[in-house]
């Protein structure tokens, strides 16, 4: 569903202490942004922020970068993050939110950033053959991620789409990743540590099984 234009979104984001206006300026320097050497985790397509707000607020020993493209959705994520941290009385020191085109993620990250973990949750499946190169798990993208993933860095991937999941398994293998965990029914698998996204709850209510894998950089 398309979000309505929110004129207040960009001014609110620019006034936010954890929003990064020009992320490409910090390519290779993200540890300096956070002011420590803690491992950095990255969510590509953070949406309304339900996932990243819980993950970041409960892992203060990690740093988090959350990326999406639309100001309207990022403004909702900003509010979700602020509320989640307020609930536990914590400061938003370990998270940064930004607008950036994910297909061009290499413009804001490089090998000096050593990302420990990437999360891709319920991305657009792009089912038509002519659009498949736009998938966030397509080899074109995976090869970008490899450049800034740390040794043994991981990609955690969730989807409700069977075709995308099956194709993505091939993509990961093709791009020299080890698949270290895989299930076609996450919520029946006994896997611990899952944080549900807004889309995930919706798909579960519809009776969909959630597919999930962890791929590790060789």
UniProtKB/Swiss-Prot annotation:
It is an enzyme of class 2 (transferase). InterPro entries: Lipocalin_CS, SAM-dependent_MTases_sf, tRNA_(Gua-N-7)_MeTrfase_Trmb, tRNA_methyltr_TrmB_bact. Its EC number is 2.1.1.33. Pfam families: Methyltransf_4. Keywords: Methyltransferase, S-adenosyl-L-methionine, Transferase, tRNA processing. Substrate binds at residues 128, 160. S-adenosyl-L-methionine binds at residues 43, 68, 101, 124. Coiled coil: none annotated. Pathway: tRNA modification; N(7)-methylguanine-tRNA biosynthesis. CDD domains: AdoMet_MTases. It comes from the Bacteria. GO terms for cellular component: tRNA methyltransferase complex. GO terms for molecular function: tRNA (guanine(46)-N7)-methyltransferase activity. It catalyses: guanosine(46) in tRNA + S-adenosyl-L-methionine = N(7)-methylguanosine(46) in tRNA + S-adenosyl-L-homocysteine. HAMAP family: tRNA_methyltr_TrmB (MF_01057). NCBIfam families: PRK00121.2-2, tRNA (guanosine(46)-N7)-methyltransferase TrmB. Belongs to the class I-like SAM-binding methyltransferase superfamily. TrmB family. Catalyzes the formation of N(7)-methylguanine at position 46 (m7G46) in tRNA. This is tRNA (guanine-N(7)-)-methyltransferase. The lineage of its organism: Bacteria, Bacillati, Bacillota, Clostridia, Eubacteriales. The gene is trmB.
């Amino acid at each position: 569903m398309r979000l309505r234009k929110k004129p207040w979104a960009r001014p609110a984001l620019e006034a936010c202490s954890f929003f990064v206006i020009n992320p490409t300026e910090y390519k290779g320097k993200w540890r300096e942004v956070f002011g420590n050497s803690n491992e950095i985790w990255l969510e590509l397509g953070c949406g309304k922020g339900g996932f990243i707000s819980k993950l970041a607020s409960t892992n203060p020993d990690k740093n988090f970068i959350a990326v999406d493209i639309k100001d309207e959705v990022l403004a909702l994520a900003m509010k979700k993050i602020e509320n989640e941290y307020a609930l536990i009385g914590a400061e938003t020191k370990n998270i940064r939110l930004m607008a950036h085109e994910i297909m061009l993620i290499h413009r804001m990250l490089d090998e000096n950033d050593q990302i420990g973990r990437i999360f891709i949750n319920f991305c657009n499946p792009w089912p038509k053959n002519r659009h498949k190169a736009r998938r966030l798990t397509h080899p074109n993208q995976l090869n970008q991620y490899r450049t800034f993933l740390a040794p043994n860095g991981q990609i955690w991937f969730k989807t409700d789409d069977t075709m995308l999941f099956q194709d993505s398994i091939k993509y990961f293998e093709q791009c020299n990743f080890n698949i270290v965990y895989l299930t076609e029914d996450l919520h029946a698998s006994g896997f611990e540590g899952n944080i549900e996204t807004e889309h995930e709850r919706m798909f579960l209510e519809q009776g969909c099984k959630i597919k999930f894998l962890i791929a590790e950089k060789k």
